[in-house]
From Swiss-Prot:
Keywords: Hydrolase, Pyridoxal phosphate
Functional summary from the UniProt entry: Catalyzes a cyclopropane ring-opening reaction, the irreversible conversion of 1-aminocyclopropane-1-carboxylate (ACC) to ammonia and alpha-ketobutyrate. Allows growth on ACC as a nitrogen source.
Species per Swiss-Prot/TrEMBL record: Methylobacterium nodulans (strain LMG 21967 / CNCM I-2342 / ORS 2060)
Protein name, UniProt field: 1-aminocyclopropane-1-carboxylate deaminase
Domain of life: Bacteria
Required co-factors: pyridoxal 5'-phosphate
Subunit structure: Homotrimer.
Gene: acdS
Pfam families listed in its UniProt record: PALP
Length: 337
């Protein structure tokens, strides 16, 4: 599906699939849980899911003649960290807008974790007080205009790389990669669980798994706490991506499965249940998830297993998208583990 698109390699190759045997047993042993370790996909600044997306965006950025990547996210954005790392790797400058998306108070929240790494990587980081929104932001446009005014040649990458024209391609590739790994494993996964916020990871999976009729087996766990906007954005990206890759069929709102039950209390703030899921996964599997994204999708998967959502005998693939560096911004929350 992706043969006609240029790709700039930023990852090691196919990410490993790991059986979560102890977690599966702890939850009753009726459902087999696995994790696809997107958090281990690259040596670039701790890696993560955004690199799959950026591999298809970088060729366009280079071809444009740009000298500066300009992007946006929250203070502890994984995406902006990855944009900063990619800019360093390809020899461009980087301008980042870090908005106040999370009502979280930690003494060093804006000095550790992802934002610290972005600064180390050489990005020009600007803090902005605007609150959370997955849409196009005026602060981002202002940064683009400022780079131009100072003689730079900006290349704009939206939050999460999601509404970029090529933003969904990387996770179409994820689905193709899973199919190849399933052939080696000798079975297919019944469900795929993924965290959903800006939408292109989920959207790309919907398109990629639609090729074999599993689009509704992609279970998005909302972490945005704005599910109506998020679902609409996933569907829009999925439709545009389907057209790009020539899927050959329309996608409907029913093809986007988004569970709204675990995003509380708000984006970026972990509930007690999210914190419990982070600890449980760490203590049973040694696998670290974060309070913003993967902790909430892990909470969702655990709860869905406990509620019997997945039929006995199901094989469930958890997409671990990365994000552990953000834990540094939650030092007080996890001060006792």
């Amino acid at each position: 599906m992706l043969e006609k698109f240029e790709r700039y390699p930023l990852t090691f190759g196919p990410t490993p699939i790991e059986r979560l045997g102890r977690l599966s047993a702890h939850l009753g042993g009726q459902v087999e849980l696995y994790a696809k370790r997107e958090d281990c996909n690259s040596g670039l600044a701790f890696g993560g899911n955004k690199l799959r997306k950026l591999e298809y965006i970088v060729p366009d950025a280079i071809a444009s003649g740009a000298d500066t990547l300009v992007s946006i996210g929250g203070v502890q954005s994984n995406h902006t960290r990855m944009v900063a790392a990619v800019a360093a790797k390809i020899g461009m400058k980087c301008r980042l807008v870090q908005e106040a998306w999370v009502p979280h108070e930690d003494a060093v929240y804006d000095r550790v974790g992802n934002i610290m790494l972005s600064r180390i990587l050489g990005a020009d980081v600007r803090l902005v007080d605007d609150g959370f929104d997955i849409g196009i932001r005026s602060s981002w446009q202002e940064a683009i205009d400022d780079v131009k005014a100072k003689g730079g040649r900006p290349y704009a990458i939206p939050a999460g790389a999601s509404v970029h024209k090529f933003g969904g391609l990387g996770y179409v590739g994820f689905a193709e990669e899973v199919r190849a790994q399933e052939r080696d494993l000798g079975f297919t996964f019944d469900y795929i669980v993924v965290c959903t916020v800006t939408g292109s990871t989920h959207a790309g999976m919907v398109v990629g798994f639609a090729k074999d009729g599993r689009e509704r087996r992609v279970i998005g766990i909302d972490a945005s706490a704005t599910p109506a906007q998020t679902k609409a954005q996933v569907l829009d990206i999925a439709r545009r991506t389907a057209d790009l890759v020539g899927l050959g069929r329309d996608l409907s709102a029913d093809d986007v499965v988004l569970n709204e039950d675990y995003a509380y209390p708000v984006y970026g703030v972990p509930s007690q249940e999210t914190k419990d899921a982070i600890r449980l996964c760490a203590r049973l599997e040694g696998m670290i998830t974060d309070p913003v994204y993967e902790g909430k999708s892990m909470q969702g998967m655990i709860d869905l297993v406990r509620k019997g959502f997945f039929p006995a005998g199901s094989k469930v693939l958890y997409a671990h998208l990365g994000g552990a560096p953000a834990l540094n911004g939650y030092g007080y929350t996890f001060r006792n583990g």
